[in-house]
Design a protein with these regions (language model features):
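Hydrophobic positions on the alpha1 helix immediately C-terminal to the Walker A/P-loop
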Residues: 67
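Extreme N-terminal, non-catalytic leader segments
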Residues: 1-53
């Protein structure tokens, strides 16, 4: 992709430009258009970043987005809004267009900037035709998000069936 970053250092940091570059890289990963050297660099660099990944899964309508929002809110309150949190929300793809429904963002109130500035990065991923409740790009997206320097990564699956255990290895 023409806009995707070419070096890991471009996605590191917590300013708007670094987050924009991270979002562009995620888009390139999702569309399988990321520079292969960059993908390898991200995979290698991510091994140096031990970031907890919390997977939230369940059936449709179980309250995954509400739970995610409440967890983010409480973490921000309990930690004095000091932690940087990434939320990766995996949405089912529409069969016609292949795009994500993006319904989760409607329920997310705690992701907006508070007095200490932007602390929560949220990105939706489409399942595409992967045949799972997670995106095929998820492992590389998690690697990129770890490289970006977040303190916690929350992954919310699409929850479309009983195969939600696919999040466990991540």
């Amino acid at each position: 992709s023409g806009y995707a970053p070419k070096a890991v250092k471009e996605i590191q940091g917590h300013d708007e430009m670094a987050w924009r570059k991270l979002a562009q890289l995620i888009t390139a990963l999702e569309n399988e258009k990321a520079d292969q050297k960059m993908v390898e660099a991200v995979r290698k660099e991510s091994l140096n970043h031990k970031v907890p990944v919390l997977g939230i899964t369940g059936t449709g309508g179980a309250g995954k987005s509400s739970l995610t929002d409440e967890l983010v809110r409480r973490i921000r309150l309990d930690q004095g809004d000091a932690l940087r949190i990434a939320v990766i929300s995996i949405d089912p793809s529409r069969r016609k267009s292949g795009g994500a429904l993006l319904g989760d963002r409607i329920r997310m109130n705690a992701i907006s900037p508070w007095s200490s500035g932007q602390r929560v990065f949220m990105r939706s991923l489409a399942t595409r035709d992967f045949g799972s409740e997670i995106s095929a790009a998820l492992p590389d997206v998690l690697a990129a998000t770890k490289c970006a320097g977040f303190d916690l990564i929350i992954v919310e699956t699409s929850g479309i069936g009983q195969g939600d255990a696919a999040i466990v290895p991540h």
